[in-house]
Amino acid sequence: MVTLLENPFRTGLRQERTPEPLILTIFGASGDLTQRKLVPAIYQMKRERRLPPELTVVGFARRDWSHDHFREQMRKGIEEFSTGIGSEDLWNEFAQGLFYCSGNMDDPESYLKLKNFLGELDEKRNTRGNRVFYLAVSPNFFPPGIKQLGAAGMLSDPVKSRIVIEKPFGRDLSSAQSLNRVVQSVCKENQVYRIDHYLGKETVQNLMVFRFANAIFEPLWNRQFVDHVQITVAETVGVEERAGYYESAGALRDMVQNHLMQLFCLTAMDPPNAIDADSIRNEKVKVLQATRLADINNLENAGIRGQYKAGWMGGKPVPGYREEPGVDPSSTTPTFAALKLMVDNWRWQGVPFYLRTGKRMPKKVSEIAIQFRQVPLLIFQSVAHQANPNVLSLRIQPNEGISLRFEAKMPGSELRTRTVDMDFSYGSSFGVAAADAYHRLLLDCMLGDQTLFTRADEVEEAWRVVTPVLSAWDAPSDPLSMPLYEAGTWEPAEAEWLINKDGRRWRRL
């Protein structure tokens, strides 16, 4: 299947922007992210003729690999995790721009070695001094890596040098502020691309178009018509091989502070003055500044955690979180988190936003659901079917699309109603598959477009919102007090209470 960017019917309709020749250096190049996501996305852009022929990719990691071995590993990744190599001629052309440099993240000599190597490649490949440095490494390597890049003078050009930082950006408000200070000590904000791959998903990007390009919806997008909003990111997988990271992170750090808060911002923000990076990010910061936990004095009314226990997934038994390899048998790390947020502004005053995420849930699904208020007078009370409130749901994954639920009369002589859905699907409407999120984000970074990347103050405001719950959950607690939910179910009973006490209920997806 072709992707949106290679749709043959679009050829010649408009000129696609192509980045300037540059060198993309990936730190942590021997890791899964590089092989599974980054290089396959770059190769797909090459297939779509979106990249200059001079584009050069340099892998940087501790392993003592040769250029050829790095190329072999990246080819395996493209064949296994993407659409395949396609033309051998195209692959050979692409491989000529793949290089490898071994070194340590905290070793100054490694950076001088890298700097000299990039200088040689710059002359050989004619990349004109343009550099992108991608930190696809463990978060504890962010500060030393950024400092060493600065000390080596590789971030000194505010126009030609950029740095991409993967999530998580800090583990709390204090560490995020500290990391921002490190970044700001060596480069300017316009050089920094804090990446959240959820912002590269088509449905997420379409949310602003849906809201601000259609007169029918935005007038209803407020407290007058909206009863509440639910944002769900559910995963079927367990902790898998990430126990070392997950034990120190948990669901709130891993998913809520970044992915769910970004979805929240795009749902709740006011219209920007223009579709550019600063205008959009200004509005996201404004709505975060107006956001608070529903009950700061009684956190049980604002946040619920949980942890999966042994259960069944796809007809097979799976272990509980505490039984996973590498996990403390008495761990109180949450694998489920639910928050109730309130926004103190004219648009949303009194409208609750319910956020939830968890591992080992029945389905892998991400959705934003806006539930509208019930009609003021139910004139069809004599009808056997009880009228349901209208719900607008935006499906981020799987099957990207939008659905509107409403009431309709059933065929026949009697007045009977039924709840029906009006659906929009990307696949069926455009006849193309949505491009991978990293595809769009990498291209935007190469083009110097920061619209889909988070700004320093935005990151800090998101941490501020969740900090009270985070502090409470980080405090030592009795393992027996941790709410549990069976693998293959939606959430612990306590999370049901969080929304049921308001006369509402979680959507069953």
UniProtKB/Swiss-Prot annotation:
The keyword RNA-binding does not apply. This is Glucose-6-phosphate 1-dehydrogenase. The active site is at 259 (proton acceptor). HAMAP family: G6PD. GO terms for cellular component: cytosol. Pathway: Carbohydrate degradation; pentose phosphate pathway; D-ribulose 5-phosphate from D-glucose 6-phosphate (oxidative stage): step 1/3. Substrate binds at residues 197, 201, 235, 254, 359, 364. InterPro entries: G6P_DH, G6P_DH_AS, G6P_DH_C, G6P_DH_NAD-bd, NAD(P)-bd_dom_sf. Its EC number is 1.1.1.49. It catalyses: D-glucose 6-phosphate + NADP(+) = 6-phospho-D-glucono-1,5-lactone + NADPH + H(+). Keywords: Carbohydrate metabolism, Glucose metabolism, NADP, Oxidoreductase. Belongs to the glucose-6-phosphate dehydrogenase family. NADP(+) binds at residues 62, 167. GO terms for biological process: glucose metabolic process; pentose-phosphate shunt, oxidative branch. Catalyzes the oxidation of glucose 6-phosphate to 6-phosphogluconolactone. One of its GO terms (molecular function) is NADP binding.
